Amino acid sequence: MYYKGRMTQQDTLKPNPSVAIGALTVSNSAPLMVFAGPCQMESRAHALEMAGALKEIAGRLGLGLVYKSSFDKANRTSLGGKRGIGLDDAIPVFAEIRETLGLPIVTDVHEPEQCARVAEVADVLQIPAFLCRQTDLLVAAAKTGRVVKVKKGQFLAPWDMKNVVAKVVGSGNANVLLTERGASFGYNTLVVDMRGLPQMAETGAPVIFDATHAVQQPGGLGGSSGGDRRFVPVLARAAVAVGVAGLFIETHQDPDHAPSDGPNMLPLRDFEALMRELMAFDALAKARSAG
Protein backbone atom coordinates (compact mmCIF):
# COMPACT_ATOMS: atom_id res chain seq x y z
CA MET A 1 0.00 0.00 0.00
CA TYR A 2 1.11 3.57 -0.66
CA TYR A 3 -0.72 5.01 2.35
CA LYS A 4 0.58 4.47 5.86
CA GLY A 5 -1.04 3.36 9.10
CA ARG A 6 -2.55 0.27 10.64
CA MET A 7 -5.22 -1.82 8.92
CA THR A 8 -8.68 -0.49 9.77
CA GLN A 9 -12.24 -1.55 9.03
CA GLN A 10 -12.42 0.62 5.91
CA ASP A 11 -9.52 -1.31 4.41
CA THR A 12 -11.74 -4.40 4.28
CA LEU A 13 -14.57 -2.67 2.38
CA LYS A 14 -13.85 -3.39 -1.26
CA PRO A 15 -15.43 -1.67 -4.28
CA ASN A 16 -16.25 -3.47 -7.50
CA PRO A 17 -13.18 -3.44 -9.78
CA SER A 18 -15.50 -3.55 -12.80
CA VAL A 19 -18.52 -1.25 -12.85
CA ALA A 20 -21.39 -1.52 -15.32
CA ILE A 21 -23.02 1.66 -16.64
CA GLY A 22 -25.76 0.31 -18.86
CA ALA A 23 -24.01 -1.85 -21.45
CA LEU A 24 -20.67 -0.14 -20.75
CA THR A 25 -17.97 -1.72 -18.58
CA VAL A 26 -15.72 0.64 -16.63
CA SER A 27 -12.55 -0.99 -15.32
CA ASN A 28 -8.87 -0.19 -15.00
CA SER A 29 -8.20 -3.09 -17.37
CA ALA A 30 -11.08 -2.51 -19.83
CA PRO A 31 -10.84 -0.34 -22.97
CA LEU A 32 -10.82 3.40 -22.36
CA MET A 33 -14.20 5.14 -22.03
CA VAL A 34 -15.13 8.78 -21.59
CA PHE A 35 -17.49 11.00 -19.63
CA ALA A 36 -18.01 14.01 -21.91
CA GLY A 37 -20.24 17.01 -22.43
CA PRO A 38 -20.45 20.73 -21.67
CA CYS A 39 -19.74 22.09 -18.21
CA GLN A 40 -23.33 23.11 -17.53
CA MET A 41 -26.70 22.52 -19.11
CA GLU A 42 -27.41 25.75 -20.95
CA SER A 43 -30.72 24.80 -22.60
CA ARG A 44 -32.64 21.78 -23.85
CA ALA A 45 -31.64 22.51 -27.45
CA HIS A 46 -27.95 22.86 -26.63
CA ALA A 47 -27.90 19.70 -24.51
CA LEU A 48 -29.56 17.63 -27.25
CA GLU A 49 -27.22 19.07 -29.89
CA MET A 50 -24.11 18.29 -27.83
CA ALA A 51 -25.30 14.82 -26.84
CA GLY A 52 -26.15 13.99 -30.45
CA ALA A 53 -22.78 15.19 -31.73
CA LEU A 54 -20.87 13.24 -29.09
CA LYS A 55 -22.89 10.10 -29.75
CA GLU A 56 -21.99 10.27 -33.45
CA ILE A 57 -18.28 10.66 -32.64
CA ALA A 58 -18.36 7.81 -30.12
CA GLY A 59 -20.11 5.61 -32.66
CA ARG A 60 -17.45 6.24 -35.28
CA LEU A 61 -14.68 5.47 -32.81
CA GLY A 62 -16.29 2.53 -31.03
CA LEU A 63 -15.85 4.53 -27.82
CA GLY A 64 -17.87 4.03 -24.65
CA LEU A 65 -19.56 7.35 -23.79
CA VAL A 66 -21.45 8.69 -20.78
CA TYR A 67 -22.98 12.13 -21.39
CA LYS A 68 -22.12 14.79 -18.82
CA SER A 69 -23.74 18.10 -17.99
CA SER A 70 -24.42 19.93 -14.73
CA PHE A 71 -27.85 21.28 -13.84
CA ASP A 72 -26.31 23.58 -11.21
CA LYS A 73 -22.76 24.86 -10.82
CA ALA A 74 -23.11 25.51 -7.12
CA ASN A 75 -19.50 26.52 -6.43
CA ARG A 76 -19.04 29.39 -8.89
CA THR A 77 -16.32 31.90 -7.98
CA SER A 78 -18.68 34.89 -7.79
CA LEU A 79 -22.31 35.41 -6.83
CA GLY A 80 -23.13 36.54 -10.37
CA GLY A 81 -21.68 33.46 -12.10
CA LYS A 82 -24.15 31.56 -14.29
CA ARG A 83 -25.09 28.26 -12.65
CA GLY A 84 -27.19 26.33 -15.17
CA ILE A 85 -30.91 25.77 -15.80
CA GLY A 86 -31.62 24.13 -12.44
CA LEU A 87 -32.78 20.68 -11.39
CA ASP A 88 -36.47 21.03 -12.25
CA ASP A 89 -35.78 22.02 -15.86
CA ALA A 90 -32.85 19.64 -16.30
CA ILE A 91 -34.58 16.42 -15.25
CA PRO A 92 -36.83 16.14 -18.35
CA VAL A 93 -33.86 16.96 -20.60
CA PHE A 94 -31.73 14.22 -19.07
CA ALA A 95 -34.65 11.82 -19.45
CA GLU A 96 -35.05 12.79 -23.11
CA ILE A 97 -31.34 12.26 -23.85
CA ARG A 98 -31.46 8.81 -22.25
CA GLU A 99 -34.63 7.80 -24.06
CA THR A 100 -34.06 9.26 -27.53
CA LEU A 101 -30.28 8.89 -27.83
CA GLY A 102 -29.75 5.90 -25.56
CA LEU A 103 -26.88 7.58 -23.73
CA PRO A 104 -26.19 7.03 -20.03
CA ILE A 105 -26.04 10.21 -17.97
CA VAL A 106 -23.70 11.57 -15.29
CA THR A 107 -24.40 14.77 -13.38
CA ASP A 108 -23.36 16.38 -10.11
CA VAL A 109 -25.30 16.32 -6.87
CA HIS A 110 -24.60 18.88 -4.16
CA GLU A 111 -27.07 18.04 -1.40
CA PRO A 112 -28.32 14.72 0.00
CA GLU A 113 -31.90 15.72 -0.80
CA GLN A 114 -31.10 15.88 -4.53
CA CYS A 115 -29.84 12.33 -4.86
CA ALA A 116 -33.09 10.38 -5.16
CA ARG A 117 -34.54 12.77 -7.77
CA VAL A 118 -31.38 12.86 -9.84
CA ALA A 119 -31.10 9.06 -9.70
CA GLU A 120 -34.41 8.82 -11.60
CA VAL A 121 -32.72 10.16 -14.74
CA ALA A 122 -28.96 9.74 -14.18
CA ASP A 123 -26.97 6.51 -14.33
CA VAL A 124 -24.05 8.01 -12.41
CA LEU A 125 -24.15 10.50 -9.54
CA GLN A 126 -21.02 12.65 -9.39
CA ILE A 127 -19.76 14.06 -6.10
CA PRO A 128 -17.87 17.34 -6.66
CA ALA A 129 -14.30 17.59 -5.43
CA PHE A 130 -15.07 20.18 -2.75
CA LEU A 131 -17.74 17.85 -1.32
CA CYS A 132 -15.89 14.55 -1.52
CA ARG A 133 -15.71 14.10 2.27
CA GLN A 134 -19.34 15.04 2.98
CA THR A 135 -20.59 11.85 4.59
CA ASP A 136 -24.32 12.56 4.32
CA LEU A 137 -23.98 13.30 0.61
CA LEU A 138 -21.92 10.18 -0.07
CA VAL A 139 -24.34 7.97 1.86
CA ALA A 140 -27.39 9.44 0.13
CA ALA A 141 -25.81 8.97 -3.29
CA ALA A 142 -24.79 5.41 -2.46
CA LYS A 143 -28.26 4.46 -1.26
CA THR A 144 -29.82 5.33 -4.62
CA GLY A 145 -28.11 2.25 -6.06
CA ARG A 146 -26.66 4.29 -8.91
CA VAL A 147 -22.95 4.36 -9.69
CA VAL A 148 -21.23 6.95 -7.49
CA LYS A 149 -18.37 8.88 -9.12
CA VAL A 150 -16.31 10.86 -6.63
CA LYS A 151 -13.86 13.57 -7.57
CA LYS A 152 -10.79 13.69 -5.34
CA GLY A 153 -10.61 16.97 -3.49
CA GLN A 154 -7.80 19.30 -4.49
CA PHE A 155 -6.79 19.16 -0.82
CA LEU A 156 -6.59 15.35 -0.42
CA ALA A 157 -3.78 12.87 -0.87
CA PRO A 158 -4.60 10.03 -3.28
CA TRP A 159 -4.47 7.41 -0.50
CA ASP A 160 -7.03 9.37 1.53
CA MET A 161 -9.63 8.31 -1.01
CA LYS A 162 -9.76 4.89 0.66
CA ASN A 163 -11.92 6.53 3.33
CA VAL A 164 -14.26 7.95 0.70
CA VAL A 165 -14.57 4.52 -0.92
CA ALA A 166 -15.33 3.01 2.48
CA LYS A 167 -18.20 5.45 3.05
CA VAL A 168 -19.84 4.51 -0.24
CA VAL A 169 -19.22 0.77 -0.03
CA GLY A 170 -20.14 0.75 3.66
CA SER A 171 -23.51 2.24 2.69
CA GLY A 172 -24.28 -0.81 0.58
CA ASN A 173 -23.04 0.29 -2.85
CA ALA A 174 -19.81 -1.18 -4.23
CA ASN A 175 -20.12 0.64 -7.57
CA VAL A 176 -17.83 3.59 -7.00
CA LEU A 177 -15.49 5.41 -9.38
CA LEU A 178 -12.67 7.73 -8.30
CA THR A 179 -11.60 10.78 -10.30
CA GLU A 180 -8.29 12.65 -10.26
CA ARG A 181 -8.57 16.34 -11.13
CA GLY A 182 -5.36 17.81 -9.75
CA ALA A 183 -4.12 19.17 -6.44
CA SER A 184 -3.80 22.75 -5.24
CA PHE A 185 -0.29 24.05 -5.89
CA GLY A 186 0.03 27.52 -4.45
CA TYR A 187 -2.55 30.15 -5.34
CA ASN A 188 -4.88 29.81 -8.38
CA THR A 189 -2.98 26.79 -9.66
CA LEU A 190 -3.42 23.03 -9.85
CA VAL A 191 -0.84 20.37 -10.58
CA VAL A 192 -1.33 16.69 -11.40
CA ASP A 193 0.87 14.08 -9.74
CA MET A 194 0.47 11.07 -12.02
CA ARG A 195 1.57 8.77 -9.19
CA GLY A 196 -1.88 9.39 -7.75
CA LEU A 197 -3.55 7.33 -10.47
CA PRO A 198 -2.07 3.95 -9.46
CA GLN A 199 -2.24 4.99 -5.81
CA MET A 200 -6.01 5.50 -6.06
CA ALA A 201 -6.33 2.30 -8.07
CA GLU A 202 -5.00 0.46 -5.02
CA THR A 203 -8.41 1.03 -3.43
CA GLY A 204 -9.76 -1.43 -6.00
CA ALA A 205 -12.01 1.15 -7.66
CA PRO A 206 -11.81 2.14 -11.33
CA VAL A 207 -9.96 5.45 -11.75
CA ILE A 208 -11.00 8.29 -14.06
CA PHE A 209 -8.81 11.23 -15.07
CA ASP A 210 -10.43 14.65 -15.44
CA ALA A 211 -8.32 16.19 -18.18
CA THR A 212 -10.13 19.52 -18.37
CA HIS A 213 -10.48 20.58 -14.72
CA ALA A 214 -6.86 19.54 -14.24
CA VAL A 215 -5.84 22.59 -16.33
CA GLN A 216 -8.16 24.95 -14.48
CA GLN A 217 -6.81 28.01 -12.68
CA PRO A 218 -9.27 28.35 -9.77
CA GLY A 219 -10.33 31.96 -9.34
CA GLY A 220 -7.58 32.90 -11.76
CA LEU A 221 -9.59 35.59 -13.55
CA GLY A 222 -10.64 37.35 -10.37
CA GLY A 223 -14.40 36.92 -10.67
CA SER A 224 -14.17 33.54 -12.39
CA SER A 225 -11.78 30.64 -12.92
CA GLY A 226 -9.23 30.62 -15.69
CA GLY A 227 -7.50 27.73 -17.38
CA ASP A 228 -5.27 26.69 -20.26
CA ARG A 229 -6.88 24.17 -22.59
CA ARG A 230 -3.61 23.72 -24.52
CA PHE A 231 -2.56 21.26 -21.84
CA VAL A 232 -5.66 19.06 -21.95
CA PRO A 233 -4.15 16.70 -24.59
CA VAL A 234 -0.79 16.69 -22.80
CA LEU A 235 -2.18 15.59 -19.45
CA ALA A 236 -4.67 13.20 -21.05
CA ARG A 237 -1.87 11.40 -22.91
CA ALA A 238 0.15 11.11 -19.71
CA ALA A 239 -2.77 9.72 -17.71
CA VAL A 240 -3.71 7.18 -20.37
CA ALA A 241 -0.09 6.07 -20.63
CA VAL A 242 0.00 5.50 -16.87
CA GLY A 243 -3.29 3.61 -17.07
CA VAL A 244 -6.86 4.65 -16.27
CA ALA A 245 -10.35 3.25 -16.73
CA GLY A 246 -11.62 6.37 -18.42
CA LEU A 247 -11.40 10.09 -18.99
CA PHE A 248 -13.60 13.02 -18.03
CA ILE A 249 -13.54 15.75 -20.69
CA GLU A 250 -15.73 18.82 -20.79
CA THR A 251 -16.26 19.98 -24.35
CA HIS A 252 -18.21 22.73 -26.12
CA GLN A 253 -18.72 24.01 -29.68
CA ASP A 254 -17.65 27.52 -28.61
CA PRO A 255 -15.86 27.32 -25.27
CA ASP A 256 -14.72 30.94 -25.37
CA HIS A 257 -18.38 31.96 -25.04
CA ALA A 258 -19.49 29.20 -22.67
CA PRO A 259 -21.11 30.36 -19.41
CA SER A 260 -18.61 28.47 -17.23
CA ASP A 261 -15.20 26.79 -17.45
CA GLY A 262 -14.65 27.99 -21.00
CA PRO A 263 -10.86 28.44 -20.67
CA ASN A 264 -10.32 24.77 -19.84
CA MET A 265 -12.98 23.13 -22.03
CA LEU A 266 -11.89 21.28 -25.18
CA PRO A 267 -13.41 22.59 -28.43
CA LEU A 268 -15.80 19.98 -29.81
CA ARG A 269 -14.01 20.11 -33.18
CA ASP A 270 -10.89 18.68 -31.48
CA PHE A 271 -12.64 15.94 -29.52
CA GLU A 272 -12.69 13.15 -32.11
CA ALA A 273 -9.03 13.38 -33.12
CA LEU A 274 -7.88 13.53 -29.52
CA MET A 275 -9.97 10.53 -28.48
CA ARG A 276 -8.75 8.49 -31.46
CA GLU A 277 -5.17 9.17 -30.38
CA LEU A 278 -5.89 8.40 -26.73
CA MET A 279 -7.62 5.13 -27.58
CA ALA A 280 -4.43 4.05 -29.36
CA PHE A 281 -2.34 5.05 -26.31
CA ASP A 282 -4.74 3.11 -24.10
CA ALA A 283 -4.50 -0.05 -26.18
CA LEU A 284 -0.70 0.06 -25.93
CA ALA A 285 -0.67 0.74 -22.20
CA LYS A 286 -3.12 -2.02 -21.36
CA ALA A 287 -1.51 -4.55 -23.68
CA ARG A 288 1.77 -3.92 -21.86
CA SER A 289 0.07 -4.31 -18.47
CA ALA A 290 -1.62 -7.54 -19.55
CA GLY A 291 1.67 -8.93 -20.81
Label every model-predicted segment.
Residues 80-88, 101, 124-131, 187-194, ...:
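Active-site-adjacent loop and "lid" segments of alpha/beta metabolic enzymes
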Residues 40-54, 85-92, 226-234:
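Glycine-rich anion/phosphate-binding loops
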Residues 38-47, 65-87, 251-262:
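Glycine-rich, proline-tolerant flexible connector loops at the mouths of alpha/beta enzymes
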Residues 54-56, 60, 82-106, 141-147, ...:
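Alpha-helix-loop-beta-strand connector modules within alpha/beta enzyme cores
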Residues 144-251:
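Catalytic alpha/beta core domains of metabolic enzymes, predominantly
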Residues 85-86, 100-114, 123-136, 147-158, ...:
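Catalytic beta/alpha-barrel core
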Residues 5-34, 283-290:
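N-terminal amphipathic alpha-helix/helix-capping segment at the start of soluble metabolic enzymes
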Residues 29-32, 61-65, 99-105, 121-123, ...:
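Short, well-ordered coil/turn segments that N-cap beta-strands
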